[in-house]
Amino acid sequence: MSALVLLDLSAAFGTVHHGTLLEVLSLRFGITGSVLEWFKSYLTGRTQTVTISSDTSAAVPLVCSVPQGSVVGSLLFIAYTGDIEESIDVYSLEHDLYADDTQLLSHMCMAEIQHRREAFENCVLAIQDWCASRRLQLNPDKTEIMWFGSRSNLAKLHMDDLCLRLGSFVINPSETVRNLGVLLDGELTIRPHIARTASTCVFHLRRLRQLRRLADQSTMQRLVSVFVIARLDYWIQYWLNYRLLLWHL
């Protein structure tokens, strides 16, 4: 048996506090002098506005957030949250960090399920406290837990064995989860992902068919590459393990 917990941070990039980030860069990574001043300059002077219809609010100075999608933004977020691993290692859980996607993983035999579930619960609570210290917000509503195993082992489990309890909040196990863009089920068959990919590709092909008379062949090839081929190429190495399921595509 294995269990995967996918943590969700609310507005993750938008809640990075500039002062705390500069302190982390200095104390944890030893960045000082002109390099630290460069980062300070990069973060300083940013503002935000809100536009509704044709009305735009006055600009408000930002003391939090790093630009999501920028080259430096992801690196700064990783630096800001890197020591979250110290809170996880206490509970002997495996983990993967992908920018603002944090995942906890554990393998176990059936007799260890309760012990491992309690480790997940305590670890998530510790991460919640760590997030508060960094002015980040863990979102339990979007945090998920997924159990993996054979069909027979999954059938033996009771709901009480599978839920995460975070104080008064209960996280029920998911039947499928989206992990880095791929839908997984409890038996790791990726059937849900194949079905979703096939449906999405057919949808786009039907839409593109309507454009055939309006665009030349080169343009159509680029559109098919962007909207269809790119989806088939994603995780293509993983697809090869499920050849019998690929007839759907």
Where are the language model's segments positioned?
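Conserved pre-catalytic core of RNA-dependent polymerases
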Residues: 1-67, 106, 224
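Active-site palm subdomain of RNA-directed nucleic acid polymerases
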Residues: 2, 74-105, 109-111
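Short, conserved non-catalytic motifs in the polymerase core
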Residues: 5-6, 50-76, 105-111, 164, ...
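Mobile genetic element proteins and their domesticated derivatives, centered on retroelements
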Residues: 8, 25, 39, 50, ...
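Catalytic palm subdomain of template-directed nucleic-acid polymerases
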Residues: 9-29, 103-129, 241-244
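Conserved pre-motif C helix in the palm subdomain of viral-like polymerases
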Residues: 10-13, 62-90, 195, 220
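Short, conserved micro-motifs composed of acidic
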Residues: 111, 122, 136-176
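Basic, alpha-helical interaction scaffolds
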Residues: 168-240
